[in-house]
UniProtKB/Swiss-Prot annotation:
S-adenosyl-L-methionine binds at residues 225, 301-303, 306, 331-332, 382, 411. It comes from Salmonella agona (strain SL483). It comes from the Bacteria. Then it catalyzes the NAD-dependent ring dehydrogenation of precorrin-2 to yield sirohydrochlorin. Finally, it catalyzes the ferrochelation of sirohydrochlorin to yield siroheme. Residues 216-459 are annotated as: Uroporphyrinogen-III C-methyltransferase. It catalyses: uroporphyrinogen III + 2 S-adenosyl-L-methionine = precorrin-2 + 2 S-adenosyl-L-homocysteine + H(+); precorrin-2 + NAD(+) = sirohydrochlorin + NADH + 2 H(+); siroheme + 2 H(+) = sirohydrochlorin + Fe(2+). Signal peptide: none annotated. Keywords: Cobalamin biosynthesis, Lyase, Methyltransferase, Multifunctional enzyme, NAD, Oxidoreductase, Phosphoprotein, Porphyrin biosynthesis, S-adenosyl-L-methionine, Transferase. One of its GO terms (biological process) is cobalamin biosynthetic process. Its EC number is 2.1.1.107, 1.3.1.76, 4.99.1.4. This is Siroheme synthase. Gene3D superfamilies: Cobalt-precorrin-4 Transmethylase, Domain 1, Methyltransferase, Cobalt-precorrin-4 Transmethylase, Domain 2, NAD(P)-binding Rossmann-like Domain, Sirohaem synthase, dimerisation domain, Siroheme synthase, domain 2.
Length: 459
C-alpha cells in the first residue's frame, strides 16, 4: 500500500490553494464543502473565485506565491500551470511538515486527491495512487450507479440511533447484528427517502423490538484456487460478516485481505502428511466458537466438499445442533486447468474427468485399472509425493507411456508455474515442483501449447 487512505477534519482549519484557474477552482470547491477556512494565492483569478470572496467564503491573495501563507496552514494544494511554482509550493510545505497536493504530479506531492462518491455522511474514495486517474474515475462512475442516492439519509439516521443501540445491546456482536438488519431493511430506506416520519418510526421500533438471533453458526466457504477474483460474491459477503475466520494455508493473502478487519483469524494450515492443527482440534474450534454465539467462517482453499474434509467438520456441528451452511468454491481442478490452457473434457480426447486424491490413508489403494482407462482426464490432488507411484501404477495397468501430463504449481496465482511432459517423466517432473500443486494426466494436456492464455513463467 503506497498511500494511507484517511479522511481529514478540515472544518474551520486554514488551508491554502496556490493557483487561480479552473483546476484550482475544482479543488477549492471540495475544500469549501469540507468547511475549510480557505486562502487562495494567484496572479489572476477566474470569476468564480471573486464570487466566493465577495460572499466571504474564502480569502484571495493576488500576486506571486507567498510561502509565509503556509505558516498557519494544515494542508496545501499547488494547482498552477507552472511546474516550477508548484515545486516551490511543495518544497515550502514539506519544510513545514504540511501535507501538500500537487495537481498532476503525484511524485511531487505528499498526498493525492481521490475520486469521491459523496453520500454524506457516507463517503467513498477511490484512488489509483496517482498512476491511473482515468481508471479511478471509471470506478467512481460505476460505484455512483450502484450506491442509492438516499444512502446518506440512512447513514445519517443510523448516527442518530447509535446511543440507543449502545444502551439496548450490551455486546459488540449484538450491535453488529442489529446494524446488519437495519442497513438491509428496504422499507426503512424507502421511508427515509420519502420523508415519511410515521413509517420511519414504526419500522425503527419494530427493528428494536425484534429479538436478535443469539445462536452461533458456521459457514463453510470455498475460497477458490488462489486468484481472489475467483472468490464468489456470496463467499465475499460471508467473510465480510464473520466474527471469526478459521482458514488454511491454501487461502491466498489477497483473499485474507478481504476479510472483515475486526474479525478474529485462526490459522489451521495443513500440509499433506503433516497437520499443523489436527482435524479433530479444528472441529472443536468451530464448535467452541459457534457455541459462544459467534458467526464463524471456515475458509478453505478450493471447494470445501472436494478433498477439503468439509463433510467431516459439518458432521461434528450437526451432532452438536449448530446451524451451518455451505458456500461452494471453484475447485483447484477447474481453476488450475483453465489457467493452464488445459480443458478437462474435449469431444476428441476426454469424455469424463476423475478427481483423485494422491494422499491416501495408510494401506489405502486406488482403482488403478479404471484410472488407466482411455478417453478420460485424471486430476490428482495432493499427489506430488506419490508422483513416481502414480507413474508406475498407471503404466503397469495399461496407460500409454507417452500420455501427456502437467503439474500446476500455485495455480491461478501470479506465481503459477506449469511443467509438462509425458507419463514416463512424471516422477522426475514432480521433483521440479513445490506444493501446492496439481497433477493432470490425459490427452487434453496436449492442447496446452495452443490454448495457454495465462502465463507468468515460460515453462
Amino acid at each position: 500500500m503506497d498511500h494511507l487512505p484517511i479522511f481529514c477534519q478540515l472544518r474551520d482549519r486554514d488551508c491554502l490553494i496556490v493557483g487561480g484557474g479552473d483546476v484550482a477552482e475544482r479543488k477549492a470547491r471540495l475544500l469549501l464543502e469540507a468547511g475549510a477556512r480557505l486562502t487562495v494565492n494567484a496572479l489572476t483569478f477566474i470569476p468564480q473565485f471573486t464570487v466566493w470572496a465577495n460572499e466571504g467564503m474564502l480569502t484571495l491573495v493576488e500576486g506571486p506565491f507567498d510561502e509565509t501563507l503556509l505558516d498557519s496552514c494544515w494542508l496545501a494544494i499547488a494547482a498552477t500551470d507552472d511546474d516550477t511554482v508548484n515545486q516551490r509550493v511543495s518544497d515550502a510545505a514539506e519544510s513545514r511538515r504540511i501535507f501538500c497536493n500537487v495537481v498532476d504530479a503525484p511524485k511531487a506531492a505528499s498526498f493525492i486527491m481521490p475520486s469521491i462518491i459523496d453520500r454524506s455522511p457516507l463517503m467513498v474514495a477511490v484512488s489509483s495512487g496517482g498512476t491511473s486517474p482515468v481508471l479511478a474515475r471509471l470506478l467512481r462512475e460505476k460505484l455512483e450507479s450502484l450506491l442509492p442516492q438516499h444512502l446518506g439519509q440512512v447513514a445519517r439516521y443510523a448516527g442518530q440511533l447509535r446511543a440507543r443501540v449502545k444502551k439496548q445491546f450490551a455486546t459488540m456482536g449484538e450491535r453488529r447484528r442489529f446494524w446488519e438488519k437495519f442497513f438491509v431493511n428496504d422499507r426503512l430506506a424507502q421511508s427515509l427517502a420519502n420523508a415519511d416520519e410515521k413509517a420511519v418510526n414504526a419500522t425503527t421500533e419494530r427493528l428494536f423490538s425484534e429479538p436478535l438471533d443469539h445462536r452461533g453458526e458456521v459457514v463453510l466457504v470455498g475460497a477458490g484456487p488462489g486468484d481472489a477474483g475467483l472468490l464468489t460474491l456470496k463467499g465475499l459477503q460471508q467473510i465480510q460478516q464473520a466474527d471469526i475466520v478459521v482458514y488454511d494455508r491454501l487461502v491466498s493473502d489477497d483473499i485474507m485481505n478481504l476479510v472483515r478487519r475486526d474479525a478474529d483469524r485462526v490459522f489451521v494450515g495443513k500440509r499433506a502428511g503433516y497437520h499443523c492443527v489436527p482435524q479433530e482440534e479444528i472441529n472443536q474450534i468451530l464448535l467452541r466458537e459457534a457455541q459462544k454465539g459467534k458467526r464463524v467462517v471456515r475458509l478453505k482453499g478450493g471447494d470445501p466438499f472436494i478433498f477439503g474434509r468439509g463433510g467431516e467438520e459439518l458432521e461434528t456441528l450437526c451432532h452438536a445442533g449448530i446451524p451451518f451452511s455451505v458456500v461452494p468454491g471453484i475447485t483447484a481442478a477447474s481453476g488450475c486447468s483453465a489457467y493452464s490452457g488445459i480443458p478437462l473434457t474435449h469431444r476428441d480426447y476426454a469424455q469424463s474427468v476423475r478427481l483423485v486424491t494422491g494422499h491416501l490413508k495408510t494401506g489405502g489403494e486406488l482403482d488403478w485399472e479404471n484410472l488407466a482407462a482411455e478417453k478420460q482426464t485424471l486430476v490428482f490432488y495432493m499427489g506430488l509425493n506419490q508422483a513416481a507411484t502414480i507413474q508406475e501404477k498407471l503404466i503397469a495397468f495399461g496407460m500409454q507411456a507417452d500420455m501427456p501430463v502437467a503439474l500446476v504449481e500455485n495455480g491461478t496465482s501470479v506465481k503459477q508455474r506449469v511443467v509438462h511432459g509425458v507419463l514416463t517423466q512424471l516422477g522426475e517432473l514432480a521433483q521440479q515442483v513445490e506444493s501446492p500443486a496439481l497433477i493432470i494426466v490425459g490427452r487434453v494436456v496436449g492442447l496446452r501449447d495452443k490454448l495457454n492464455w495465462f502465463s507468468n513463467y515460460y515453462d
